[in-house]
Curated annotation (Swiss-Prot):
It is found in: Cytoplasm. It holds the Pfam family ThiI. Residues 60-165 form the THUMP domain. This is Probable tRNA sulfurtransferase. Its EC number is 2.8.1.4. Signal peptide: none annotated. It comes from Listeria welshimeri serovar 6b (strain ATCC 35897 / DSM 20650 / CCUG 15529 / CIP 8149 / NCTC 11857 / SLCC 5334 / V8). The keyword Magnesium does not apply. It catalyses: [ThiI sulfur-carrier protein]-S-sulfanyl-L-cysteine + a uridine in tRNA + 2 reduced [2Fe-2S]-[ferredoxin] + ATP + H(+) = [ThiI sulfur-carrier protein]-L-cysteine + a 4-thiouridine in tRNA + 2 oxidized [2Fe-2S]-[ferredoxin] + AMP + diphosphate; [ThiS sulfur-carrier protein]-C-terminal Gly-Gly-AMP + S-sulfanyl-L-cysteinyl-[cysteine desulfurase] + AH2 = [ThiS sulfur-carrier protein]-C-terminal-Gly-aminoethanethioate + L-cysteinyl-[cysteine desulfurase] + A + AMP + 2 H(+).
Length: 403
């Protein structure tokens, strides 16, 4: 069966009252980005639903693109016919024939908002149901638990029919809750944190710290590939790759070994916060899980957070490793994350890092070195790319030089 459109039902948008229009607009924007390589697709957003007009594009590919988009409760491939009963009958029969199985059951659920159509909802149910039964053997009616539910929506602009409902990703449209910077390493936790933030409508821009020659091009590419996995939830992800070698070397030379990780994280957070300011972000997201490593104790978090007043969102803070791994496997980032390429969080790691660093001592150690000039240099040399779901590739950002 060739479908000419897809009907999208909204998720939590139904509770957003006066702000509903901006949520619908944002969802339409994300859907458009996800359909970037389907040029004939057209999107029509209405108050209670959205239509994707396929114009000959592959409906199966369009369905795959819609499945991970946050803000969609469910969607159905559909066909539109004119307000003629014979056309409705023929389309209904073709739809049910396409999906029914031997000795299957079905139900017709009609809704008529266009009052000039000659039949009311109950009459449509009876007329179409009888026609389908007459033309398909070994098919029976079950109104409570049917194998196939044929929905018919009679509107002024035509009659819309569908018989398959696909569950969407739910949540809020990415970008509807504002923008945040995701500190994206090559590990398991940070992609999961990014995914969970996106589910609540946060548009993430990934920040990855690259320290060649200590970290390889493969490690950098792994981070880009992880960003591509996250891009499918909103259509694309902007990624900032920060040259971090000089800062890490200076930390290793000037800072006591036991607090190297604390100072390293502080420098990362300073850079991320400055990027957030330039990119008009509202928060920073990271993959910290309380007590998992030395830099993720409450005392360490306190010392690290002291460099900023920006909200730090930690979606996985209360999860254990197994819970995080389960989500990573679900979103298809786990196999990438466990590839054995070192990132800047694992180089220069001391054998016995402090789990309860003192902020006053940390600040004193840092005061003997001009880290600010190194941070400025790193910010001036950031590489910014855009990672697209449709291409799974990277495009150098034309505005990167603004940093």
């Amino acid at each position: 069966m060739e479908f000419d459109r897809i009907l999208i039902r909204y998720g939590e948008l139904s509770t957003k009252g006066k702000n509903r229009k901006q949520f619908v607009t944002r969802l339409a924007h994300n859907v458009k980005r996800a359909m970037k390589d389907l040029p004939e697709v057209r999107i029509h957003g209405e108050r209670d639903r959205m239509y994707i007009i396929l114009n000959g594009e592959d409906h199966k590919l369009a369905e795959e693109r819609l499945k991970p988009i946050f803000g969609i409760q469910s969607f159905s491939p559909a066909v539109r016919v004119n307000l003629e009963l014979d056309e409705v009958k023929n389309a209904a029969l073709a739809l049910v024939q396409d999906v029914h199985e031997q000795n299957g059951t079905f139900k017709v659920a009609a809704r008529r908002s266009h009052r000039e159509f000659p039949l009311d909802s109950n009459e449509i149910n009876q007329e179409i149901g009888a026609y389908v039964l007459q033309n398909i053997e070994d098919l029976s009616v079950n109104v409570k638990n049917p194998d196939v539910k044929l929905t018919i929506d009679v509107r002024k602009e035509g009659v819309f029919l569908s018989c398959r409902t696909i569950i969407g990703a739910a949540g809020l449209p990415v970008g509807s809750s504002g923008r945040a910077m995701l500190m994206l390493s090559g590990g398991i936790d940070s992609p999961v944190a990014g995914y969970l933030a996106q589910k609540r409508g946060v548009e993430i821009e990934a920040v990855h710290f690259h320290s060649p020659p200590y970290t390889s091009e493969q490690a950098k590419q792994k981070a880009v590939d992880l960003a591509a996995k996250l891009a499918k939830y909103g259509g694309e992800v902007k990624m900032h790759i920060v040259p971090f070698t000089e800062i890490q070397e200076m930390i290793k030379q000037q800072i006591p070994e036991s607090v190297i990780m604390t100072v390293t994280r502080r420098m990362m957070l300073k850079i991320t916060d400055e990027l957030r300011r330039k990119r008009n972000g509202l928060a920073i997201v990271n993959g910290e899980s309380l007590g998992q490593v030395a830099s993720q104790t409450l005392e360490s978090m306190l010392a690290i957070n002291a460099v900023t007043t920006t909200p730090i969102i930690r979606p996985v803070v209360s999860m254990d490793k197994n819970e995080i791994i389960q989500i990573a496997q679900k979103i298809d980032t786990y196999n990438l994350s466990v590839q054995p390429f070192e990132d800047c969080c694992t180089i220069f790691t001391p054998p016995s890092p402090k789990t309860k660093p003192k902020l006053d001592k940390i600040e004193r150690y840092e005061s003997f070195t001009d880290f600010d000039s190194l941070i400025t240099k790193a910010l001036d040399n950031i590489e910014t790319i855009t990672v697209n779901i449709t291409e799974n590739t990277q495009v150098k950002d034309e505005f990167a030089d603004l940093f």
